[in-house]
Amino acid sequence: MNSKRGMFTREYLWRSIVTMCGLFVIVITLGIGGFLVYKGSGTFLKFHHSIGEFLFSSDWAPVDNMEGGGKVGTLIFIVGSLSTCGLALLIATPFALGSAIFMTEIAPKFGEKFYRPVIQIFAGIPSVVYGWVGLTVLVPFIRDIFHRQVGHSILAAGLVLAIMIFPTITSVAADAIRAVPKDYRMGAYGMGSTRWQTIYKIVLPASASGIFSGIILGLARAFGEALAVAMVDRKSVV
């Protein structure tokens, strides 16, 4: 009886601790959101800028004084972010999915011992390093290829972001594919399916939700990497 009561007490204690931690995170998140709303509302309430101007105007020339004024159109930044992240996903996703299939289905021993650690190392490289490589290598390359005066562009930013999110998508997709039960593969082979038929018709559909989660995580990282994008894209387009 005492042992059961002790187990119940410990379970209740740990459940309370986890609940408080979760509530703490929620409160902090709401506090950050409230602070941003409070500070940003002055743009509309105090300086009388409209939401339509803020969202649908491309004129960005704010005035740094107590009276406010200027122009605060963010459309160019919204379109630039969406274009850059979309281009990065289009470039990175096929290569990441192919790499995940290679390291789990084609060469699992090589993938586990060599390829996976390399991917994890690339995932831990700071964004400033990617931005510096893009600035010193990719930007001059694009300038020479397209005969532009300046190589800073959405193409350069998209390529840098694609390289940055490639390890994230690859790692999550590989884990999702690896989690597919072995019985699925054995059943497909028993019915006469080839390796590629098994991968395409059995493994990928079974791991689709995990692969999609990897793509979403890659997209989230792409939206958050402002430093690398700022180094290679200066409001110009290809």
Please provide the spans of the model-predicted regions.
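Transmembrane alpha-helices
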Residues: 172-173, 195-233
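Membrane-embedded alpha-helices of multi-pass transport/permease systems
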Residues: 34, 94-99, 118, 156, ...
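Conserved small/polar residues in nucleotide/adenosyl-binding loops
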Residues: 237
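Transmembrane alpha-helix signature in integral membrane proteins
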Residues: 72-102
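N-terminal, non-cleaved signal-anchor transmembrane helix
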Residues: 1-82
